Amino acid sequence: MSMLRRPLTQLELCEDDIQWLTDQLNKRVLPAVIVPKCEMMDIDEMEPMDQSEPPRGITRRNLRSADRKNRDVPGPSTGECTRTSIAPTLTSARTPVAAPTLTLSTPVNPVSSAEMLRVMPPRVGRRPRASRSGDNDSPLLFNAYDTPQQGINDESPTPSDSPESPNAHLYGATPGNPTSTSGGPSSNTRSHRH
């Protein structure tokens, strides 16, 4: 029984401590929260501050601002209220956040276009290279495997000896042997596949 009483007393003490801490926190936080709420309810210029602080109370403050907007809608000075509410946003603490975004957004667009213009000339420079290689690659499009060997064939007189398989001379095949003519293309493809 004594073993059961000790944890119970400890739990009770913990609960008492938790309740005491929560009471103190409520006593300290509530007046601090109530004061700005009263100020915000009384002063219309604090509405943008409500919107600029979403993590503390999103739903309540947004509802309050929406209610105020709805109350201002039937009035003839709706535009004036919105303008006055926008003016404090620029003069409030949100200005350092909004000002750099506005100042950065305007020059970033021309800079990005200039960067795009700067990037394009290298691409245009690469295109002539591709066109040059394309001019040189025109035989490669027809004979992808034979192009390096065609250069060798042009220098050597052997291609006249083997008209059926232009690369047969590289593999030691002669046109007189029927096995060489039949095995020539297969040997070419096998050797080039590796």
Swiss-Prot record:
Signal peptide (from-to): none
Q: Where is the composition biased (Polar residues)?
A: 79-94, 102-112
Q: Where in the cell is it found?
A: Nucleus
Segments for region (Disordered)? 47-194
Q: What is its main location?
A: nucleus
- List cellular component terms (GO): anaphase-promoting complex
Biased segments, Low complexity type: 154-166, 174-194
User: Which pathway does this polypeptide act in?
Assistant: Protein modification; protein ubiquitination
The question of whether Cell division is a record keyword is answered with yes
Keyword line: Cell cycle, Cell division, Developmental protein, Meiosis, Mitosis, Nucleus, Ubl conjugation pathway
Knockout or disruption consequences = RNAi-mediated knockdown results in arrest at metaphase during meiosis I in early embryos. Defective embryonic polarity due to improper first cell division.
GO BP annotations, alphabetical order: anaphase-promoting complex-dependent catabolic process; cell division; meiotic cell cycle; protein ubiquitination; regulation of meiotic cell cycle; regulation of mitotic cell cycle
* Entry superkingdom: Eukaryota
Q: Which family does it belong to?
A: Belongs to the CDC26 family.
How does this chain assemble? The APC/C complex is probably composed of at least 12 subunits: apc-2, apc-10, apc-11, cdc-26, emb-1, emb-27, emb-30, mat-1, mat-2, mat-3, such-1 and gfi-3.
Job of this protein? Probable component of the anaphase promoting complex/cyclosome (APC/C), a cell cycle-regulated E3 ubiquitin ligase that controls progression through mitosis and the G1 phase of the cell cycle. The APC/C complex acts by mediating ubiquitination and subsequent degradation of target proteins. Developmental role in early embryogenesis and the metaphase to anaphase transition in meiosis and mitosis. Required for embryonic anterior-posterior axis formation.
Report the protein name in the record: Anaphase-promoting complex subunit CDC26
Q: Which organism is it from?
A: Caenorhabditis elegans
Q: Which gene encodes it?
A: cdc-26
